[in-house]
A protein has these predicted regions:
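Extracytoplasmic ligand-binding site segments that recognize negatively charged/polar headgroups
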Residues: 33-41, 61-64, 78-210
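Periplasmic-binding protein-like
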Residues: 109-110, 186-191, 198-199, 230-254
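Short, low-complexity disordered leader/linker segments with a strong preference
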Residues: 1-29
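A ligand-binding cleft/hinge motif common to bilobed small-molecule-binding domains
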Residues: 87-92, 210, 215-233
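Loop/turn elements at helix/coil->beta-strand transitions in domains of secreted/extracellular proteins
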Residues: 27-28, 52-54, 77-80, 152-156, ...
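Short amphipathic alpha-helical coupling segments at ligand-binding clamshell hinges
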Residues: 42-43, 182, 186, 248, ...
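Short alpha-helix C-terminal cap/hinge motif
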Residues: 42-57
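A bilobed periplasmic-binding-protein/Venus flytrap-type ligand-binding module shared by bacterial periplasmic
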Residues: 127-132, 172, 247-259
């Protein structure tokens, strides 16, 4: 999913460079995002192909890190615009009233706040490296609870519920199927089997499966579907507990008179062309 970034900067954390820090429309828009490389690439292409090349910078963060910044910094955050898990945006808006009402129409089946427009919907799935499954004579899991089996110990990668929204998909499915207490017990054993492969990034389990470092992971379904279609030794299982989904949305920071008007225009561009 990663591509060379010729005109934008993506950093793992820290402060953005080239921020707008003012209302002039000639200043670059600072975009904070928790999105994976593939989604960022789509947003970049939308902006670059519609007149906004060299007018923005992207700064990447883990979900929990960016969520913490939104809650702690509110309107004082350096970003002009964010793309983020919708439930985090809702929490930040409820606490800080920090987002502008979007000034363009947003057509959705579900109801969203007038400050956020969904850009992606993501589902979780069990991912497998079929070559490694055969090599180590591992049976294919059919449900999330199967990931607690001892045969998978050392062959499993998972995301950390403290840092990745992808782990939220796993946790919600477990709670729905087994209740909160049993879900915690199941998750604890899954983490034991994952060992050193409890990852911060939602795409990390797939990347590890793709690289042949682990045989099984829990990650984003659409990424596994794409890898399988491209002929990689990747397959996926929709767990019997169900596929939960979450949305990622775009929002514009309300900086009052210092709000850069390009932020709304770029948000609309991402929605219409991303």
């Amino acid at each position: 999913m990663a591509v060379p970034l010729a005109t934008t900067a993506i950093t793992g954390c820290g402060n953005a460079t080239g921020g707008s820090s003012g209302k002039g429309s000639d200043a670059k828009i600072v975009i904070y995002s928790n999105a994976d490389d593939e989604a960022i690439t789509a947003m970049q292409n939308a902006l670059d192909n519609n007149g906004y090349k060299d007018k923005y910078t992207f700064n990447g963060f883990g979900t929990s890190e960016l969520g913490g910044k939104l809650l702690a910094e509110g309107k004082n955050i350096e970003a002009d615009m964010v793309t983020m898990s919708t439930f985090y945006l809702d929490s930040a808006q409820q606490q800080n009233k920090m987002f502008q009402k979007l000034d363009f129409p947003v057509k959705t089946l579900d109801k969203f706040g007038d400050y956020a427009a969904p850009i992606t919907s993501q589902e979780g799935a069990i991912i497998m490296n079929t070559d490694l499954m055969k090599k180590h004579n591992l049976s294919a899991p059919t449900c999330l609870k199967d990931l607690t089996k001892k045969e998978y110990k050392g062959y499993l990668a998972i995301t950390d519920v403290k840092s990745s929204s992808t782990a939220w998909l796993l946790m919600q499915a477990l709670i729905s199927a087994y209740g909160e207490k049993e879900a915690q017990n199941i998750l604890k054993q899954i983490y034991v089997n994952a060992g050193d492969h409890i990852e911060d990034s939602g795409s990390a389990p797939l990347k590890l499966c793709r690289a042949g470092e682990v045989a099984i992971g829990f990650g984003l379904r659409h990424q596994a579907v794409a890898d399988k279609a491209n002929g990689q030794p990747i397959d996926y299982v929709d767990p019997t507990e169900g596929n939960f989904s979450l949305t990622e949305s775009v929002a514009v920071i309300d900086k009052g008179k210092d709000t850069n008007p390009l932020a709304q225009k770029m948000a609309q561009c991402i929605i219409e062309h991303g």
